[in-house]
């Protein structure tokens, strides 16, 4: 037995209440035995001002804070293992989440888009109903490929995506961006590359996986049920046009110089942000379009 008095005016103190209730139960069920160290069954009693709550064992849930109590954020959902786990981690800290995905047809397929929608649907079990914003990213991505130094392509693309994500976030009154980056996991996630991507826009970027290794991230992915969907073999836009030897320690000066040589990029980003497809994600809906 465990007792708690939310109503301190109740005449019996918690230990006394436990003794009385325990004696009552043993009187009704004499085959029971008391084991305070390793009980097979715990009964909880909570005294309130207008009654009492009685319940059995606690069932562990996700924990954390109620969704929505810490603000609103936009999660960059690529379709891989990391970004769904990042969304889950931040939802546990009370953020109300929406997702943004960058699609580059014909280089990326409809199946890749369906995969991301399925991931958003699986995450809705933890985050609640949300919106999935699908950005038509083909033209900005081709423009960067055709006009920028090959070794800087990945960081320039990440900066472009963050600028578009900020435009979408501002339109929907979201206060931060979320990414699934883990320090030094790939070339675009070194300290220098992250510093360059951070400088692209001014919304806070939350990176809950930054200190985790892949084994830890995969374990969470399996736990929340997104792993099997994440490993489906449909290519997303982050893996196309990838240079064989990207620069791992770019400087902000050379990144900004490369962007100065792409005067048409800002307009392409604006158009992409204004033509996003908005897909409502509801708990219990069909994962297919």
Feature roles, as predicted:
Residues 20-25, 31, 58-70, 137, ...:
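Active-site adenylate/phosphate-handling loop in enzymes that bind or generate adenylated species
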Residues 80:
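Conserved G/P- and acidic residue-centered "switch" motifs that form tight phosphate/ATP-binding loops
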Residues 185, 233-241:
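Small/polar glycine-rich anion-binding or flexible loop at a beta-alpha turn
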Residues 225-233:
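A short alpha-helix-loop-beta-strand transition element characteristic
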Residues 55-57, 100-102, 135-138, 179-180, ...:
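Generic beta-strand/beta-sheet core signal
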Residues 1-74, 84-130, 139, 199, ...:
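RNA-binding accessory domains that recognize and position tRNA/RNA substrates
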Residues 259-260, 264:
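Trafficking entry modules
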């Amino acid at each position: 037995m465990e007792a708690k008095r939310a109503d301190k005016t109740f005449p019996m103190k918690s230990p006394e209440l436990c003794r009385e209730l325990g004696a009552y139960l043993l009187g009704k069920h004499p085959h029971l035995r008391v084991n305070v160290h390793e009980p097979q069954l715990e009964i909880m009693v909570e005294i309130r001002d207008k009654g009492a709550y009685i319940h059995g064992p606690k069932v562990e849930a996700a924990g954390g804070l109620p969704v929505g109590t810490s603000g609103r954020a936009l999660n960059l959902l690529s379709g891989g293992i990391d970004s769904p786990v990042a969304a889950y981690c931040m939802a546990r800290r009370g953020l109300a989440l929406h997702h943004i995905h960058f699609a580059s047809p014909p280089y990326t397929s409809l199946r890749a888009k369906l995969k991301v929608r399925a991931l958003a649907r699986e995450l809705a079990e933890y985050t609640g109903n949300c919106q999935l914003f699908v950005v038509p990213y083909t033209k900005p991505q081709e423009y960067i490929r055709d006009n920028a130094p090959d070794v800087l392509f990945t960081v320039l693309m990440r900066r472009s995506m963050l600028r578009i994500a900020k435009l979408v976030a501002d339109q929907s009154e979201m206060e931060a961006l979320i990414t699934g980056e883990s320090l030094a996991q790939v070339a675009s996630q070194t300290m220098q590359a992250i510093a360059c991507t951070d400088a692209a826009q001014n919304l806070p970027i939350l990176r809950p996986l930054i200190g985790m290794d892949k084994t830890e991230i995969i374990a969470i992915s399996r736990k929340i049920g997104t792993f099997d969907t994440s490993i489906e073999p449909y290519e997303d836009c982050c893996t196309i046009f990838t240079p064989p030897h990207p620069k791992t320690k770019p400087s902000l000066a050379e990144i900004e110089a490369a962007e100065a040589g792409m005067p048409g990029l800002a307009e392409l980003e604006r158009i992409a942000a204004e033509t996003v497809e908005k897909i409502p994600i509801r708990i219990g809906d069909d994962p297919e379009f």
